[in-house]
């Protein structure tokens, strides 16, 4: 018996092609795509506006399968983290961050990461494999279901019948975080007046485990689904890819699927960045800054976001801040300063709060929009740099850095 094809692996063009190979018209592919992504449906039998003969054929040849959540942890600030089984003893993590006017989902692109950035928990596990498109978009698909964010077929503009899978009783109460005065500026849209139209998940950031641009094809397939009106219909401005700086892939992303861009910078000069972000040895800062300028020619935003983790007595001096001002002088940008989030045996400490404030002030005085990320979810190891999952390392070793989490 043939292994069923997972339809979550296809963007709309891929699904249209797959349907055409079976003698089906393009509109049938779009119908099924709406059921999968808008409504979170997995049972072809429930797709009531799809011909019964096609439903039967799909039940034989296809499936809709997202990663399975094997752990679910909720922080005191409302942040929610899932450990997701992706097979072969590998697990990745996704994080939902609720805020007053938006909900941001941080998703992973690889099981582990080969780039081995010095301050990142994921990199210390080594690398196993790229996630499939289904495993990437499946994180958004699953989070929508678990958070009650899937639309109701009965209430859709297409008039599709069927059960209401959008159980609003499961929607996470964003007010829990608000009551504590929690903020997370660097996850925010730069358009605070924008409304997210009642979506539970209004923004997606590719800032989880792995280097997204090292898994280019599968990530772009997932991005296209996020943007597609037949699937999630997110604005390009509300989808962000974060990269450590793989320059050729940045150029490809600009040409094929330009979304908001964040760059993990973390140092103002090549000597220091070579130590902290080893990919810099291949694509040094001069090439990276030029790639950022090229990206802005087609980007949905008129700036690049530079992420900068604040490491005590490593990259946080006034001189480092002034060097950054010079480095980015010709690149329209904003900075997110990220207080380092500790993990076992990292060898780094977080910069003191006063030093972070002074560092930010130098950037702001130079006219650079600068925010300091409010740490979210660190009590469940969901904060930036703490995502670890479980990875069977094919490059060096097998290390598990997951701490036990309370199940919901």
UniProtKB/Swiss-Prot annotation:
Cofactor binding note from Swiss-Prot or TrEMBL: Binds 1 [4Fe-4S] cluster. The cluster is coordinated with 3 cysteines and an exchangeable S-adenosyl-L-methionine.
Catalysed reaction equations from the record: adenosine(2503) in 23S rRNA + 2 reduced [2Fe-2S]-[ferredoxin] + 2 S-adenosyl-L-methionine = 2-methyladenosine(2503) in 23S rRNA + 5'-deoxyadenosine + L-methionine + 2 oxidized [2Fe-2S]-[ferredoxin] + S-adenosyl-L-homocysteine; adenosine(37) in tRNA + 2 reduced [2Fe-2S]-[ferredoxin] + 2 S-adenosyl-L-methionine = 2-methyladenosine(37) in tRNA + 5'-deoxyadenosine + L-methionine + 2 oxidized [2Fe-2S]-[ferredoxin] + S-adenosyl-L-homocysteine
GO biological-process terms attached to the record: rRNA base methylation; tRNA methylation
EC number: 2.1.1.192
GO molecular function: 4 iron, 4 sulfur cluster binding; metal ion binding; rRNA (adenine(2503)-C2-)-methyltransferase activity; rRNA binding; tRNA (adenine(37)-C2)-methyltransferase activity; tRNA binding
UniProt-annotated stretches for the region Disordered: 152-196
Cystine residue pairs: 106-384
A Pfam match: RlmN_N
Active site residues per record: 93, 384
Keyword Methyltransferase: yes
Basic and acidic residues biased stretches: 157-178
Entry keywords, A to Z: 4Fe-4S, Cytoplasm, Disulfide bond, Iron, Iron-sulfur, Metal-binding, Methyltransferase, rRNA processing, S-adenosyl-L-methionine, Transferase, tRNA processing
Binding site for [4Fe-4S] cluster: 113, 117, 120
Gene Ontology CC entries for this record: cytoplasm
Domain Radical SAM core: from-to ranges: 99-379
Binding site for S-adenosyl-L-methionine: 210-211, 242, 264-266, 341
Family matches, as PROSITE patterns: RADICAL_SAM
Family the entry assigns: Belongs to the radical SAM superfamily. RlmN family.
Miscellaneous section: Reaction proceeds by a ping-pong mechanism involving intermediate methylation of a conserved cysteine residue.
Name of the protein in its database record: Dual-specificity RNA methyltransferase RlmN
Record organism: Aromatoleum aromaticum (strain DSM 19018 / LMG 30748 / EbN1)
Gene assigned in the entry: rlmN
């Amino acid at each position: 018996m043939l292994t069923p094809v997972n339809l979550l692996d296809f963007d709309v063009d891929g699904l249209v092609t797959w349907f055409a190979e079976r003698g089906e018209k393009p509109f049938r592919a779009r119908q099924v795509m709406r059921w999968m992504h808008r409504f979170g449906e997995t049972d072809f039998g429930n797709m009531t506006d799809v011909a019964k003969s096609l439903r039967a054929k799909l039940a034989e040849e296809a499936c809709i399968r997202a990663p399975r959540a094997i752990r679910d942890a909720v922080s005191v600030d409302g942040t929610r983290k899932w450990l997701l089984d992706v097979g072969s003893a590998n697990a990745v993590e996704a994080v939902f961050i609720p805020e007053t006017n938006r909900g941001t989902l941080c998703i992973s692109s690889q099981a582990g990461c080969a780039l081995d950035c010095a301050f990142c928990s994921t990199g210390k596990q080594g690398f196993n494999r790229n996630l499939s498109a289904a495993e990437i978009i499946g994180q958004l698909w699953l989070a929508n279901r678990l958070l009650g964010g899937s639309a109701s077929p009965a209430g859709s503009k297409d008039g599709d019948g069927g059960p209401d899978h959008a159980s609003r009783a499961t929607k996470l109460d964003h007010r829990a975080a608000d009551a504590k005065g929690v903020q997370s500026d660097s996850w925010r849209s730069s358009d605070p007046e924008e409304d997210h139209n009642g979506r539970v998940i209004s923004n997606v950031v590719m800032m989880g485990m792995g280097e997204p641009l090292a898994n280019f094809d599968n990530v772009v397939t997932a991005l296209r689904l996020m943007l597609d009106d037949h699937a999630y219909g997110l604005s390009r401005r509300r989808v962000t890819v974060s990269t450590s700086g793989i320059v050729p892939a940045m150029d490809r992303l600009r040409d094929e699927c330009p979304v908001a861009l964040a760059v993990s910078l973390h140092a103002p000069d090549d000597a220091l960045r070579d130590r902290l972000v080893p990919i810099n040895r291949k694509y040094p800062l001069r090439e990276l800054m030029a790639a950022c300028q090229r990206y802005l020619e087609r980007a949905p935003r008129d700036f690049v976001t530079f992420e900068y983790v604040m490491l005590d007595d490593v990259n946080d001096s006034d001189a480092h801040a002034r060097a950054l001002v010079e480095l980015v002088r010709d690149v329209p940008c904003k900075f997110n300063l990220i207080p380092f989030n500790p993990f076992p045996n990292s060898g780094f400490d977080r910069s003191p709060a006063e030093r972070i404030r002074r560092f930010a002030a130098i950037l702001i005085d130079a006219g650079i929009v600068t925010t300091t990320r409010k740490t979210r979810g660190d009590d469940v190891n969901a904060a930036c740099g703490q995502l670890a999952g479980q990875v069977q390392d094919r490059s060096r070793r097998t290390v598990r850095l997951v701490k036990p989490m309370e199940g919901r």
